[in-house]
Amino acid sequence: MSETLLPGSGFDTYEEQDKVLVGMSGGVDSSVAVRILQQQGFAVTGAVIRFSPAHDAAVEAAQKAAKQMEIECIVLDAQELFEQEVVAPFCADYCAGRTPNPCVRCNPAVKFTALLAAADKLGIQYIATGHYARVEVDGDGVSRIHLPESAARDQSYMLSRLDQDVLSRLILPLGEFEKDDVREMARDFGLDCADAPDSMEICFIPDGDYPAFIEARGLAGKAGHFISPDGADLGPHQGVLHYTVGQRKGLGIALGEPVFIREICENGDIRLARGGEEYFTTVTVAGLVTPDGAALPAGEYLVKVRSAAPAQPAVFDGTDTLTFASPVRAPAPGQTAAFYRGGAVAGSGFITHAE
């Protein structure tokens, strides 16, 4: 393939005019990914996924971007699967006092499942997205998600549950770039989306009001009481779906000192803590997966307990327990714990408990 702007590793292994299906949203990241792949000599087809009625604007934007770049953009309808695998569990988690991460669930269960199925149907070998991460093949032939060049835009956490079926066919063209570089490339390419705003965090709830979204579905979180740091009953709260571990604002409580949510109990009570008491050393996880499907070995890892949190050293016991070298803030049940070793994702599990 021709020498062009992408400095990423592994591109010399592809053949001229290899076909790639690019997941598009109409935003700057996926659009620049298309242009980079075109410059690398790939035959690019776009695909936009309709996850819910809230995605109609994204479908229109992706089709507009594809038209400008003179590529076909197919529309994949994943609404039923998205409801089953993402929306319903999201609502159930909040109603039970857990804090879900819908993107981490969606990527393996819906987004990349839909892209692979479409690629297979079209006879396309590779898939690609505009995520900020890298895919590299280790010495054992296992493809793994690696940290991107841009620590500020790192999305490896969101991709931490992908398996070999996806990883062995996945190309991530933006892994070597900073966001500002991507926007500058979009301007150089003359793309209309160059200055488009970044996508929202919860794509199926445009206004971000997830309690209202859940309640509109006829659901309610467990009722219970606030319990003070000293064990006193402070009266009822609004229902657990309105709260998350580590939260300080919006509690509606005045104790004369800052307090945080330390624990959302199974009975619906919410235990509060003074500043500094929302840190934990031991975290239990479930649903562990690894890139190669093998069991995650016991040992030392760097672990992220939230997407934006820095990875922290921890020892995994080989079963379900992490012990951090230093306390980590507010590891919330329902969130993902992403394990890293050597700059690569080694595994991923869901937090069930912290102490």
Regions flagged by a language model, labelled:
Residues 13-17, 128-135, 139-355:
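AMP-forming adenylation/ATP pyrophosphatase catalytic core
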